[in-house]
Amino acid sequence: MSIMPTLDMDKDTFTQVGYLYNLLDKIGHLGLFERDLSCYMLEVLAVDSQNMREINFAHRAKNSTTDVLSFPLDVSEGADSHILAKQMKICLGSVVINYELAQKVAKQRGHSTQDEISLLFIHGFLHILGYDHEVDNGEQRALEQKIIESLGLKESLIVRNTT
């Protein structure tokens, strides 16, 4: 899978989120997903808190900022979809990360901004793939935990927000 960065911030931010390419590659090589992720691409947007508030209001009618939002695109799983994906690199959707809030939370929790963005990215990516911790029976929580442990990260976003 490839990442199509659409960064709404300065050049330094682009450099700092470049590691997401490697993170996504590592996630793909864990062998946790049925579909071949190399056939798809994913848009990642890094925005500030004000822009995230506006996006959250426009799409969820919540007039507050948040850390990560996901916008999956409807990708057919028909017989020809995999062939088409290999030829065209179909976009699965967009993950929007509040870079400003990620920096703040990382400082509060005593870990790097890169680790915080990694947690947000993993969480958003699983939503793109159709997982939903608000309605599933723990599938997203379990998979998120497996991924972060495999990558040596500290805590699941879902677990952190329920404690």
Swiss-Prot record:
Residue numbers binding Zn(2+): 123, 127, 133
GO MF: metalloendopeptidase activity; RNA endonuclease activity; zinc ion binding
Segments forming a coiled coil: none
Localization annotation: Cytoplasm
Keywords associated with the record: Cytoplasm, Endonuclease, Hydrolase, Metal-binding, Nuclease, Ribosome biogenesis, rRNA processing, Zinc
Cofactor note: Binds 1 zinc ion.
EC number: 3.1.-.-
A Pfam entry, by short name: YbeY
Gene3D superfamilies: Metalloproteases ('zincins'), catalytic domain (3.40.390.30)
Gene Ontology biological process terms from the UniProt entry: rRNA processing
Cofactors: Zn(2+)
Family matches, as SUPFAM superfamilies: Metalloproteases ('zincins'), catalytic domain (SSF55486)
GO CC, one annotated term: cytoplasm
Keyword Iron in record: no
Entry similarity comment: Belongs to the endoribonuclease YbeY family.
Role: Single strand-specific metallo-endoribonuclease involved in late-stage 70S ribosome quality control and in maturation of the 3' terminus of the 16S rRNA.
Name used for this protein in its record: Endoribonuclease YbeY
Lineage: Bacteria, Pseudomonadati, Campylobacterota, Epsilonproteobacteria, Campylobacterales
